[in-house]
């Protein structure tokens, strides 16, 4: 449990104790204590409507109940300085600032661990994201999915979940067949032989490059080889090349996966046959018109789904069912899939499949990522000015940098459309949210360097109770919120809450800096306390930015 959560827990305990002391209700009758943080801080740090909740049981007016609760509340036990009653009976609690100052050494001593919580209780969570076809470059939708997915994984890990990151390689479908034929055509052309590109082939420069490389390395060896042997070679070589490129781009984007899972392995290991056998045994499939159907309507889907077509081939759904069964067999408590908006209609049938296999459909969670629209010079940017094609992850990294991309992609809820202003992303102004947060960190580091010059880094006793000004208290309260923000954002799968928090903490720091002379040679005792406060800000801001995958520069 973290420090601010401890205070909330103590307040709840004291409210319950006050109810019993005032004989307003029995222990069984006490409703769940709800504590909220008022947006207007003049209404306190926490507020409860307990008096209104007790009105029916106590048979008294809420205002009278509130007065009795306040009279029986032990402020000292809950680190509360004062309590006020507002309106019809809201009770507002104001924290004791001396408690807040104890946060400073707590944060500094915790270091990178500050913000960690036990919310997840070690629950095993698998997050599958990106999973783009290995047939070309990653586009902006993939980039946003990568940023949101990786931030969510970092967030879940910080909150005490056991997280596994997974990339599903679609290497068994028709797109890989077309990749192999495209590689073959470019290889033949590089040898000076006539070979038309397949109708649904891949015309990118990377496929031309593969063809030239093959011609240089192998000459005409595969032009003369057995057709089956050469096809397998083109397929494997093209797949290996494209995957290596994807992995390199993702690593440059600071995204690493624990597992790269091959769709082909589901066929080789008999996983598809096993999944179909389970569905058949549970009477979840039937034959009709020469095809095999899944009774997905039983589980809320709008129609039953074909698993095996009348020509004997599988639909896309069949290996997906086998894949999700494999995930569940690996012992994960939760499966989180991050999909593009075009997959929204796919959710009911996947949940139906999981239920039909005998698992709880709520085990699967799907986070939808909406499209990204680039803007430059105030205009929509539909195509890359350099290539005339869709802008890729790699190209945008070169244009605006990884930090800006990671922050911008993660700062809105994934299910909302994102307008990405390229000019804003590279601007050195307070309007640029990533610059604003990073500049706050650099500013803190500058203050700490000044503190070292004043001899404030030598250790010794620190009088934290001197940190009492209005702006200092606001900053301390914001620092204290971080673990609760992590816990709540992780539970609700809302990674953008972390960028919101980083912005708010940066704003509190800038506000304090503009209002106070942080370090004063004429008052070294206060300066020492503020020096430690700045260390706590640096730690917390670093930890927040680390969740988002953004660097925390010491100088800017």
From Swiss-Prot:
Encoding gene per record: argS
Native source species: Bacillus cereus (strain ATCC 10987 / NRS 248)
CDD domains reported for this sequence: Anticodon_Ia_Arg, ArgRS_core
Subcellular location as annotated: Cytoplasm
GO terms, molecular function: arginine-tRNA ligase activity; ATP binding
Known partners and oligomeric status: Monomer.
Record's protein name: Arginine--tRNA ligase
Keywords associated with the record: Aminoacyl-tRNA synthetase, ATP-binding, Cytoplasm, Ligase, Nucleotide-binding, Protein biosynthesis
GO biological process: arginyl-tRNA aminoacylation
């Amino acid at each position: 449990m973290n420090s601010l959560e401890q205070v909330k827990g103590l307040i709840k305990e004291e409210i319950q104790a006050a109810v019993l002391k005032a004989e307003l209700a029995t222990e069984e009758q006490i409703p769940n204590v709800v504590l909220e943080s008022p947006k207007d801080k003049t209404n306190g740090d926490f507020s409860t409507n307990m008096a209104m909740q007790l009105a029916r049981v106590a048979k008294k007016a809420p205002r009278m109940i509130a007065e009795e609760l306040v009279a029986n509340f032990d402020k000292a036990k809950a680190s509360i300085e004062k309590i006020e009653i507002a309106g019809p009976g809201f009770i507002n609690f104001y924290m004791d600032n001396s408690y807040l100052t104890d946060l400073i050494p707590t944060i500094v001593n915790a270091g990178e661990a500050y913000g960690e919580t036990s919310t997840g209780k070690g629950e095993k969570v698998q997050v599958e994201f990106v999973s783009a076809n290995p047939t070309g470059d990653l586009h902006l939708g993939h980039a946003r999915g990568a940023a949101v997915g990786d931030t969510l994984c970092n967030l879940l890990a910080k909150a005490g979940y056991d997280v596994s990151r997974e990339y599903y390689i679609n290497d068994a479908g028709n797109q890989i067949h077309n990749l192999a034929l495209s590689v073959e055509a470019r290889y033949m052309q590089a040898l000076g032989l006539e070979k038309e590109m397949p109708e649904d082939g891949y015309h990118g420069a990377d496929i031309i490059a593969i063809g030239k490389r093959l011609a240089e390395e192998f000459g005409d060896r595969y032009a003369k080889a057995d057709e089956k042997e050469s096809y397998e070679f083109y397929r494997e070589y093209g797949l290996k090349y494209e995957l290596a490129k994807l992995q390199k781009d993702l690593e440059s984007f600071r995204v690493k996966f624990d597992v790269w899972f091959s769709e082909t392995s589901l066929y080789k290991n008999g996983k598809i046959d096993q999944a179909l056998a389970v569905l058949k045994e549970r009477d979840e499939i039937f034959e009709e018109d020469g095809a095999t159907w899944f009774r997905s309507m039983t589980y809320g889907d709008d129609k039953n789904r074909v698993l095996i077509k009348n020509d004997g081939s599988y639909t896309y759904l069949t290996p997906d069912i086998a894949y999700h069964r494999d995930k569940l067999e690996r012992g994960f408590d939760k499966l989180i899939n991050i999909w593009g908006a075009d997959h929204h209609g796919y959710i009911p049938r996947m949940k139906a499949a999981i239920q039909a296999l005998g698992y709880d459909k709520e085990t699967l969670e799907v986070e939808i990522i909406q499209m990204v629209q680039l803007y430059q010079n105030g205009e929509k940017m539909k195509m890359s000015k350099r290539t005339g094609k869709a802008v890729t992850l790699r190209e945008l990294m070169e244009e605006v940098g990884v930090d800006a991309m990671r922050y911008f992609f993660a700062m809105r809820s994934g299910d909302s459309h994102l307008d990405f202003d390229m000019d804003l992303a590279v601007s050195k102004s307070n309007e640029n949210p990533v610059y604003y947060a990073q500049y706050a960190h650099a500013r803190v580091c500058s203050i700490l360097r000044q503190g070292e010059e004043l001899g404030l880094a030598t250790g010794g006793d620190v009088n934290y109770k001197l940190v009492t000004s209005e702006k200092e208290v606001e900053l301390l309260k914001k620092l204290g919120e971080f673990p609760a923000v992590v816990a709540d954002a992780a539970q609700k799968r809302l990674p953008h809450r972390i960028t919101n928090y980083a912005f708010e903490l940066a704003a509190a720091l800038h506000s304090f800096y503009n209002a106070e002379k942080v370090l004063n040679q004429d008052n070294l005792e206060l300066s020492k306390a503020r020096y430690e406060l700045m260390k706590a800000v640096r730690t917390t801001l670093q930890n927040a930015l680390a969740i988002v995958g953004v660097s925390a520069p010491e100088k800017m």
